[in-house]
């Protein structure tokens, strides 16, 4: 028996604007091939595991003390990493870190959104953006992407000018479609904003062929914040570490809304260890890009429509019934993601043998009624 199980959510004094909402979450199922959450499939090296073990062990000796509430050493390491990756000279004052990029985004909306303010996104895109807007009582606006799921910059500029949102979400590479946004397009969006902040979500930035938007922060210090994560290319999803890059004044704003001691000493120690092994870990990015291209070409040859991707996942279709097709993949031991786009599914790029399993299942499905829009019999 579970204590209190006689009541339901309807019995609680829940905020009216949260009633009828659904929680975020990808299915967590034990299947042979899991390609639904865009993790790096390559496990950490033994050297990294040993470093994390040692570093966390040292931090554990001080567990009776609160952690560094501002995570200064970690933020300094993140600045050093980005200096090398982007060529932009950053300091600890330009970095903020939290428990995953979703907490970063939540803190941004706590500081710059809220009642009476609005945020706009260009959909389909990352589904947590409107959820975080709802949670912070920020009015959520949205505009459609182009038919190929790319960002229609002309439309975006018009929407920004007409609706004057306080926050603009741009995801590059976009999740779930995978396209990156060139710097010249970002400039157009930023120039269209009289006020407000553009949040550039670069969760998959290490995979992108485009330069990071970090290069534009000095030109647009009041308008641009870049959000990033160690959960994807960095193979640190279990560590839960996200961060943002911005002008120092934005970091001051984060101090106003963060919870005390929000990053544990163990998280800080493990993340710093992961950063020390960045070169080894990120060597897998080239392998994943090559696998992405192989899978995309193979799916195209089977007759699927594949959306060109600049990330570690692929959006593909078209299916007569995407939810039923998702289930058919699952029946074959392959878990991918139904992202709610009619006719399309998204697959993470995994290890070569996992990708082969996806392609084998796809070859079977292309001959079924679920792929009727492809002309299959």
Curated annotation (Swiss-Prot):
A GO MF term: pyridoxal phosphate binding
Pathway assignment: Amino-acid biosynthesis; L-histidine biosynthesis; L-histidine from 5-phospho-alpha-D-ribose 1-diphosphate: step 7/9
Domain of life: Bacteria
Record-linked CDD domains: AAT_like (cd00609)
Entry's EC annotation: 2.6.1.9
Pfam families given in the database record: Aminotran_1_2
Keyword Electron transport appears in the UniProt entry: no
Signal peptide coordinates: none
Claim: Transferase is one of the keywords in the record: yes
Cofactor(s) demanded: pyridoxal 5'-phosphate
Residues annotated with N6-(pyridoxal phosphate)lysine modification: 232
Database matches in Gene3D superfamilies: Aspartate Aminotransferase, domain 1, Type I PLP-dependent aspartate aminotransferase-like (Major domain)
SUPFAM superfamilies found in the cross-reference section: PLP-dependent transferases
Catalytic activity: L-histidinol phosphate + 2-oxoglutarate = 3-(imidazol-4-yl)-2-oxopropyl phosphate + L-glutamate
Keyword terms of this UniProt record: Amino-acid biosynthesis, Aminotransferase, Histidine biosynthesis, Pyridoxal phosphate, Transferase
GO biological process: one example: L-histidine biosynthetic process
PANTHER family: HISTIDINOL-PHOSPHATE AMINOTRANSFERASE (PTHR42885:SF2), HISTIDINOL-PHOSPHATE AMINOTRANSFERASE-RELATED (PTHR42885)
Subunit annotation: Homodimer.
Family in the record: Belongs to the class-II pyridoxal-phosphate-dependent aminotransferase family. Histidinol-phosphate aminotransferase subfamily.
Protein name, UniProt field: Histidinol-phosphate aminotransferase
